[in-house]
Regions:
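Flexible "cap/lid" subdomain of the alpha/beta-hydrolase fold that forms the substrate-access gate
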Residues: 1-10, 19-21, 29, 64-103, ...
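Conserved HGGG/HGGXW glycine-rich cap/lid loop of the alpha/beta-hydrolase fold
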Residues: 22-70, 91
Length: 255
């Protein structure tokens, strides 16, 4: 098992959605939100240790893992970060957790940012990992960004083009993304547990491929509209922001 037996798996339905999540531990609540192309499984190496001090909640975002994977609407609004943030709040409310810490990586950090904007009163402290602001990244697109983050522009293409191309060999695409984003000096097999990789592959079905594409389509459309409204608003939440020393964000942006 990737997670300790003390973690309980649940799936709850609400607001025309269904979110899969694991939870367990003791102490104040800590919501952990994964990125692309992973699922809640990405936290398996740290969850047990964190659970000694915190009550851990690890959901699958909509469109990912074993959560709800709806067909994207024309305006992609059902994959907006506002909607994803509401999903996370619904999970925490279901568990009776009115105030909590939140940490997110990659796409999960963008959802965590939206949670801090829309539900500031619920957040004790936040941690964003490996992101720069979406609006800033699109607004300052250059060759380095377009090359390093080519998937931002590939996954948003319409008419199921990326879905069909990725769907030809999902396992290859998923593993290649993880390889390219991780330390080149460490062998792939040393960085990733085989069970975790197999779980990512199991979840990366046709619906999940579409869901992740819709996540990025929303980022380039409805999320930009929402971010424009709040782009000059500073968070009052105590915040820790982290980047990988060898990662793209640290090398590319003034962070």
């Amino acid at each position: 098992m990737l997670f300790d037996k003390s973690f309980k798996k649940e799936k709850i339905k609400f607001d025309n959605s269904e979110i899969n999540f694991l939870h367990g531990g003791k102490g104040e609540a800590l919501l952990l939100i994964h990125g692309f192309p992973q699922t809640h499984t990405m936290w398996h190496k740290v969850a047990k240790e964190l659970a000694k001090k915190y009550y851990i909640v690890c959901p699958d975002l909509r469109g990912y893992g074993d959560s709800f994977k709806p067909t994207g609407l024309k305006d992609h609004s059902n994959y907006s970060k506002k909607v994803m943030a509401k999903d996370m709040i619904n999970v925490m409310d279901y568990l009776g957790l009115k105030k909590f810490y939140v940490a997110g990586h990659d796409r999960g950090a963008r959802v965590a940012h939206r949670i801090c904007l829309d539900y500031e009163e619920k957040i004790l402290k936040a941690c964003f990992m490996d992101i720069a602001p979406t609006y800033h990244m699109f607004e300052n697109t250059n060759q380095a960004f377009a090359t390093g983050y080519y998937h931002w522009f590939f996954l948003i293409q319409p008419d199921y083009l990326p879905e069909k191309m990725i769907g030809d060999d999902p396992a290859y695409y998923l593993k290649e993304k993880l390889k390219r984003w991780s330390d080149k000096d460490i062998a792939f097999e040393e960085k990733f547990d085989d069970k975790a990789i197999n779980e990512y592959i199991r979840c990366y079905d046709e619906a999940s491929i579409h869901g992740s594409c819709e996540d990025y389509r929303a980022a380039a459309s409805i999320d930009m509209i929402d971010d424009e409204k709040t782009r000059n608003r500073k968070l009052n939440t105590p915040l820790l922001v982290l980047w990988g020393e060898k990662g793209f964000v640290n090398k590319t942006y003034d962070v």
